[in-house]
Amino acid sequence: MNSAFQNIRMRMDWVKELPDVFLDRQIEQKFRWLSILWIMALYVAGVFFWGNFLNWTRTPLDFEDWGIINSPRLDFFADMFREDKLPLHMDYPKIEGQEHPLHRLTDRYLAIPDVITTPQILLLKFLSINKFVYIDILINFTIATLGLLWFRKKYELSLLAYGILFLLFNFNGYIQAHYAVGHITWGGYFLFPLFVALVIQLVEGQPNWMWVTKVAFLLYYMVLVGSQHHFIWALIFFGVLALTSWDKLKWIIAAGFFSGLLGAVRLLPPILIISHVYDEGGNRLLPGYPTIVDVFRSLAILVQPSEQNFVRSDVSWLMHWEFNIYVGLVGSLFIIYFGMISWFRNARRYPALQKLFLPTLVVFILTIGHLYGFLRKFHIPLLDGERVPSRMIGLPLAVIILIATIYFQAWLDEKPKMNLLVVVLSFSMFILIANDLWAHAEAWKLSAMRTAFGPVQMALAGSSVGNHPDQPYFTVIIVGTLLSIFTGMFLLFRSWREHPLIGK
C-alpha cells in the first residue's frame, strides 16, 4: 500500500515539475528525453513552416524577383548541367519594362556578386528550381539552428527561452519577406548566430589563427550563398568592433583581410563591371527608414505585402519587404524590454555583450534615412554596393533577438521556482509569438504573393549558357580561384600548427 502511494506521489511530483522543466535548466536535467524531444520538435516545425511557406514547391516562381532575377539565374545553372558547360556567360533576352537577371550590366555571370555558387547548386542537376529552393533554405536554416544551439549551451537557456529564440530568429517578418519576394540570396541571414558567436569568442578569449580561419570560412560561405550584402554588414560590424577592442585589433584585421582573400574567387570578378555600375547608376543610394518610429511600427504591425507606403520613404515604389521586421506586439515587447532595456540596465552582467553594443548601434543607425551616405563618401566599391540601407537591419535585429533571449533567461533565473505567474506569462509569450509569426506567414507565403502581384515574363526555354572568348574575365577568375585555394591552405596550415592532430 505504501509502495503504491509512493508511486502515485512520485508521478504527481513529475506532473507538477513538468512546467518548470521548460523554465529551469536544473530541473530539465531530470528529463533529458524531453529536452531532445523539444529541440527536435522545434526543428521539425521549422521544416514544416518553410515547406508550407513555399506551398510545398507547388507555386510557380514567376513573380517579382523570383521571376525577374533568381529563377532565370537558377535555370542558368540547370542549363549548365544539362549541357556540360561552365557557368561563365549568361545569354538571356532583355524584356521591355523589366529588370534583367544580371541587371543589364554584363553577360559575365560570375561578375555579379550576389549570385549563388554554393556546393548545393549541384542539386539543380537532379531537382527542379522549386525543390532546390526548399532544400537550400533548409540547409541554411539548419546552420542557423546549430548556431542557436551554441547560444543555448553557452548561456544555459531553458527549453522555453530557446523556443522563443528559435521562433523570433528563424521566422520573423524580415527573413519571411525577403524569401517571399524572391531574395534567395538572403541565406546569409541564417549565418548570423555563428557570426555573433565568433565575435563573443573574440571578446572573451585570446583569438588565434583557428579563430581567424573559422571567421574566414564562415564569411566565405556567406559570399558563396550570394549574401554579398550580409558580408559587407559583417565587415562593418567588425570595423566598429575594432574601435572598442584595440587589444584584439590585429586579429580583427586579419579576419577581415583573409575573409576577403578566401572569397577572392567571387569577389574579384565584380571588379570588371564596377565602371558600368557607376555609369548606369546601378548603385544609386535609396533611403532607409525615415524615422526610428517607422522601425518600431514595422516591428509590431503586420502589413500586407501589396500595401504601399506604410513606411513613407522618399521613393514611393519601395515596397514593404524592404522594411519588414515583423515579430508581432508580444515579440516587440519581448525584444524592447529584454533586448534593449535590460541590456542597458544590466550591461555588467555579461561583460562580453557590452562590446556588441556599439557595432550593433552603428549598423542600426546606418539603416535610418540617408545616413549610410556618409560611408558612400569614401567611394569604396564594396561599401558602394549597398544601395538599400534598410536591409542592413537584419544584423542588429539578429543581435538584439539573441541578447533579448539571454536576458530573458537571466530574468527567469531570478524568479522563484514553481511561480505560477512566471509559468503562465512565459508560455503565453511563446504561444502568442508563434501565432503572430504564423499569421504573418499566411499573409506573405508564396501563393499569396503570386496572387497579389501576378506573374512576370520569363524566358526559360532553350539554353541560357552563352559562353564565348573573354580573356580578361577568364584571367580574373583564375587569379581569384588561385588566391582562394592558397588562402584556404594557408589558414588550415596555420590552424593545424596551433592545434596539431598528429601526435596527440
Where are the regions that the model predicts?
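Membrane-embedded helix bundles of polyisoprenyl
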Residues: 43, 145-151, 160-204, 208-244, ...
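Transmembrane helical bundles and short interhelical boundary loops of multi-pass, membrane-embedded
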Residues: 5, 59, 371-374, 415-504
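Membrane-interface helix-loop-helix junctions at transmembrane boundaries of multi-pass membrane enzymes
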Residues: 245-252, 336-374, 416-419, 497-503
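Start-transfer (signal-anchor) and selected internal transmembrane alpha helices
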Residues: 1-53, 142, 482-504
